[in-house]
Amino acid sequence: MSLAGEACGYDPDRTVKMVSGGPMMGFAVVGLDSTTKKTTGGLLLLSAGETNVTKTTHCLSCGKCADVCPMHLMPMNTVFYTEAADYEGAARMGGVLNCIECGACAYVCPARQPLIQSIRLAKAELRKRRAK
């Protein structure tokens, strides 16, 4: 077991989900060794009773994600364009490159859309394509 695991009280029999970075801006990780470094801000080790796994449904077009966005972006457009692999559309219509990845949109989404994951994917693809 890693030093981080020992410090956190990691129990592989109880832990069903690990989140690196905290509850709002963190991301799910597979293992402790590859994700913990001196810049890691937090590490959540969750048991089955501490997770609320809900299924993602189609976007309801409620606009809650846009209402809470501190950058006044349209996160719902990012998911739409990212699912279609139209990353330029995500930048143009969703403003994905201006996103600060605060997680507010994902927190309020009643459809549990993977907003932050879509934003991170679109940003990575855009940077990769524009670097060529």
Name every feature range the model reports, one short phrase each.
Residues 1-111, 117-123, 131-132:
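Redox cofactor-anchoring modules in respiratory/redox and cofactor-processing assemblies
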